[in-house]
Amino acid sequence: MKLTADRYAGASSSLTLDTDALSRYTDLVDLSIGDTDFVTDSRIIEAAARDARAGYTHYGFPQGDPQLIDAIRSSWKEDYNVDISRDEIFISASSCLGMSQLMTAVLNPGDEVIVLAPYFALYRQQIEMAGGVCVEVASYEEEAYALNAERLEKAITPKTRAIILNNPCNPTGAAYTRRDLELLAETARKHDLMLIGDEIYTRYVFEGEFIPMLTLPGIRDRLVTLNSFSKNFMMTGWRVGCIICPPELRKVIQWVNGAQIYTAPSISQRAAIEALAIRRDIEKLYVSRYRERMVYASDRIEKIPYMTIARPRGTFYLFPSIKKTGLSSKAFCAEAVNQAHVLMSPGCAFGACGEGYVRIAATQPMEKLAAAFDRLEQMKF
């Protein structure tokens, strides 16, 4: 008996890591995982526990906790002077699930979605599971991963449905300028395309400022913004995010969600309310530490003879080239585990133009980062 559908023939993870490395090397430094090393702030945990005892342990509202929806609206107004109606917000059980539900809601079979590569490793899977086609538009280290209008235009066909922009970008650390975003908006209007802003690391812009796509004029009718509490608030395990989009699309996403999990976890939504209330403190206490790590890691990479890097402007990821070694991304990562006891993600997992690169997550304390780079400097090829 065949157990799986034909469409999943040959399905495998794009991000293949040496998960046995930790058992082989007790001194392994794991720089592969995009999970913060800080525990969720105690005030958030305590608020969630208090609300759990008060009875927030049942199904919630399908659209999301009304108090959380209003807290999101207030934060957008205070932080970016953007007005958002309640009908435009849907609370998702993570932005990752939200993106999958969005693809299901907007794609017809064969629709093409442009992703700016290197891109978040799950985009292709999310698009293809919804019957779409993932189209990569490359960006390059030599251009500081800036948006290239000519390559973008060439990728657009009559089947193009949407463009996804991850800002700031996992894995490259690129943070896009207002001019980049205006160019993207102009292209979307010209070709009548949907714009999807995957804005997960909004607090992690270390050069310049984070510019939400919602601040651009004249694109609200074609714009979808995904936000998450995972990285900004050290809440990866709580699984809560939100989608901001036109009301008619929000209703369809909510319908899709109803057939899957019905509603995001009530207790996680209560935690998210507290997170927004103390967001200034969170930024001061935690995000500033990542800025220090990113500067340190960039400096160390620039001193390693076989690596080059376009210094990241945001996120907590670095994406150095290892082309000088002559190894593929996967082969280099295997050598790094065996020689240096350092685990990283191969760049090929993030699109074709990621081959020859590795992703480093600065999600370890400074002393472990230092140890990792000390060992990487000693590698022989």
Identify the meaning behind each predicted range.
Residues 29-37, 50-69:
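A glycine-/small-polar-enriched, mobile loop at the entrance of the PLP active site in fold-type I
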Residues 2-10, 21-25, 29, 35-51, ...:
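PLP-dependent class I/II
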Residues 59-92:
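Conserved N-terminal alpha-helix of the aminotransferase class I/II PLP-enzyme fold
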